[in-house]
Amino acid sequence: MARAKFERTKPHVNIGTIGHVDHGKTTLTAAITMTLAALGQAVAKGYDQIDNAPEEKARGITINTAHVEYETANRHYAHVDCPGHADYVKNMITGAAQMDGAILVVAATDGPMPQTREHILLAKQVGVPKLVVFLNKEDMMEDAELLELVELELRELLTEYEFDGDDIPIVRGSGLQALDVMTKNPKTQRGENPWVDKIYELMDAVDSYIPDPERDIDKPFLMAVEDVFSITGRGTVATGRIERGKVKVGDVVELVGIRDTRNTTVTGIEMFKKSLDEGMAGDNAGVLLRGIQKTDIERGMVLAKPGSITPHTQFEGEVYVLTEKEGGRKTPFFAGYRPQFYVRTTDVTGTIKAFTSDEGEAVEMVMPGDRIKVTVELINPIAIEQGMRFAIREGGRTIGAGVVSKIVK
């Protein structure tokens, strides 16, 4: 069987904890797993197990990320928590841990801090659709009025970054108190402790406020071309991994990028040397194309549902520039810098025409380790869309990672 199906009874949602350092993200993550473990819907993870996050590589960049999973009555969740601020920045920009929504953790004792603002901005720019707020360390706040003020300030901040500040659920509680109760009595159920109930209240908010993600298979068809070859008597085959949607024999698809966009008809689909009627998201497939010569198509183009994606040469992006220690550049670069932009399956040369700091202030040069907004012009048009990830490379090594925030031309 080439296509065993993974059946899941509940919708799957990817989320993560974001927020300022020491505001209690990891403690809250541990508290969620321990609370839901009492219902048999999670494996309890202690703080240390989450804090010692393993290293992973995404787009040539090393990131520390902890993954936990748990279920509520309605959904199955994969949850990411990062130990360090730089890990969050890299994680969100590379899309290593795709988030369908996030829990913004804010310590009531501090209120919103610089990284709170930075994570909200990042979430907006990389396309995290919805946030739920956990106002942590409520046990350390005597003054109810002060709590109200912090909440008000948060709602204003969220609105400033175009989230729905008025409607976002803000749940007050204490991750530490809940974790403490669950550690002493791992069987504590809902209704037996006010701090544990706050965790349930938070999960109810996440369940109801963060929407079910659209599955890749329901999106318009797209496959980035990795390789091309001719089959005598049958025509030209493009191979690659189907990124989203599905494709059937007889479908008309568009060939987009590098050269003028053109239509062609799919006359065959193969996977594991067997022919299929239909290929779908996640499949590594070979697609036979009518009336296309081997010279008409090359790596870096995409096959897509007609009209679903267009070629562009200019875009704005959010970029993280690697430090020397991470394998990046030793020296700064200036406007006019010409690296390669690795998009899906190919390197395209482009120029970084202009850049600003993340908050939009003018900067003279970019240092390794900086996070910046860039305007890029590519030498060839490529199928690009908002939210798409790319790597920046120089002589074959990755020196930065980015996400497209806006198409210019």
From Swiss-Prot:
A single Gene Ontology MF term assigned here is: GTP binding
Output the InterPro entries linked to this UniProt entry: EF-Tu_GTP-bd, EF-Tu_GTPase, EFTu-like_2, EFTU_2, G_TR_CS, P-loop_NTPase, Small_GTP-bd, T_Tr_GTP-bd_dom
Q: Which Pfam families match?
A: GTP_EFTU, GTP_EFTU_D2, GTP_EFTU_D3
Q: What is its EC number?
A: 3.6.5.3
- Region of interest (G4), ranges: 136-139
Substrates-to-products reaction catalysed: GTP + H2O = GDP + phosphate + H(+)
Keyword annotations of the record: Cytoplasm, Elongation factor, GTP-binding, Hydrolase, Magnesium, Metal-binding, Nucleotide-binding, Protein biosynthesis
Enzyme class, UniProt record, top EC level: hydrolase
By its UniProt entry, which CDD domains does this protein fall under?
EF_Tu, EFTU_II, EFTU_III
Q: Does the keyword Ligase apply?
A: no
The record's GO CC annotations read:
cytosol
User: Where do the segments described as G3 lie?
Assistant: 81-84
Tell me the subunit arrangement. Answer: Monomer.
Q: Could you say which protein family the record assigns here?
A: Belongs to the TRAFAC class translation factor GTPase superfamily. Classic translation factor GTPase family. EF-Tu/EF-1A subfamily.
Would you tell me the protein name for this molecule? Elongation factor Tu
Per the UniProt record, the source organism is Trichormus variabilis (strain ATCC 29413 / PCC 7937) (Anabaena variabilis)
